[in-house]
């Protein structure tokens, strides 16, 4: 039996717990193993209800150090507390699951090295492209292939805003507000619209594809804040649609990583 500790119990954490409970009978039959959530760390304990069988604490470090936990699911976000939790958990021989692309892009090299020394697994599939298994594809299916380049739309917020500016003739600000209302953009969407989120993702993909350390510090970054309705109009008249993409390629000149509108 694998005992899971959820570090963070917001929308994603609650949905994950529900999913694990709903698949309680199918998971063991598919992989001959069982998973249960045994601990939750949540800053808002007084505002929520919890399963009585689950230990709840406000201190995430309790999970990282607990002998009752085998797997830490990091749902905190950011790189401050999340970093401390992940490093501490690995030192205590706990496997890690995280969709935190900032954490992986900025500290992945250190995390993976420490994980190898402690013989634990670090899963970060959802850090890039959500449910599309691109990490597994690059790591396993294409492990022996020589990848020359990767290009793609890797930030949903930018993609939605640009699509709304084009199809609905919305201004940038109106499209951004609509993205917030529909839950496609964070309350503070800075990392999305300035290109940082895409830079984190393309760094992760490049490090796997080319088997290098994270190239984040060398990524050329440009967001979509300066794109106007006039830009959209002219591109449409020429038969094009502006998109924000992440690009990485390798050549005799070296490895290039960039994220910008095209």
Label each residue range with its predicted role.
Residues 13-14:
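N-terminal Rossmann-fold NAD(P) dinucleotide-binding loop
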Residues 22-50:
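NAD(P)-binding Rossmann-fold cofactor-contacting core
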Residues 140-200, 205:
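Conserved anion/nucleotide-ligand pocket segment
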Residues 58-99:
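Rossmann-fold NAD(P) dinucleotide-binding segment
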Residues 176-262:
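Substrate-binding/catalytic subdomain of NAD(P)-dependent oxidoreductase enzymes
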Residues 9:
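Glycine-rich Rossmann-fold phosphate-binding loop(s) that bind the pyrophosphate
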Residues 1-4:
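Extreme N-terminal starter segment of soluble prokaryotic enzymes
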Residues 83-88, 101-139:
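Rossmann-fold NAD(P)-binding glycine/threonine-rich loop
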């Amino acid at each position: 039996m694998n005992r899971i500790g959820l570090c963070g119990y917001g929308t994603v954490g609650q949905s994950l717990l529900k999913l694990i409970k709903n698949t309680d009978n199918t998971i063991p039959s598919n992989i001959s193993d069982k998973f249960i959530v045994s601990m939750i760390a949540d800053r808002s304990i007084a505002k929520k209800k919890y399963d009585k069988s689950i230990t709840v604490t406000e201190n995430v470090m309790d999970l990282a150090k607990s002998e009752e936990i085998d797997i830490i699911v990091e749902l905190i976000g950011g790189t401050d507390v999340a970093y401390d939790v992940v490093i501490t958990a690995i030192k205590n021989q706990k496997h890690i699951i995280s969709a935190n692309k900032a954490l992986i892009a900025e500290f992945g090299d250190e995390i993976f090295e420490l994980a190898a020394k402690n013989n634990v697994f670090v899963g970060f599939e959802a850090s890039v492209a959500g449910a599309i298994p691109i990490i597994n594809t690059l790591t396993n299916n294409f492990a022996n292939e020589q990848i020359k380049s990767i290009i793609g739309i890797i930030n949903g917020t930018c993609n939605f805003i640009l699509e709304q500016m084009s199809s609905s003739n919305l201004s940038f600000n109106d499209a951004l507000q609509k993205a917030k209302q529909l839950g496609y953009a964070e309350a503070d969407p800075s990392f999305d619209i300035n290109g940082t989120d895409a830079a984190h993702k393309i760094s992760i993909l490049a490090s796997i594809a080319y088997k290098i350390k994270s190239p984040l510090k060398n990524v050329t970054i440009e967001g979509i804040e300066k794109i106007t309705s006039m830009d959209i109009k002219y591109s449409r008249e020429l038969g094009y649609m502006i998109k924000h993409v992440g690009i990485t390629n390798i050549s005799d000149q070296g490895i290039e990583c960039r994220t910008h509108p095209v």
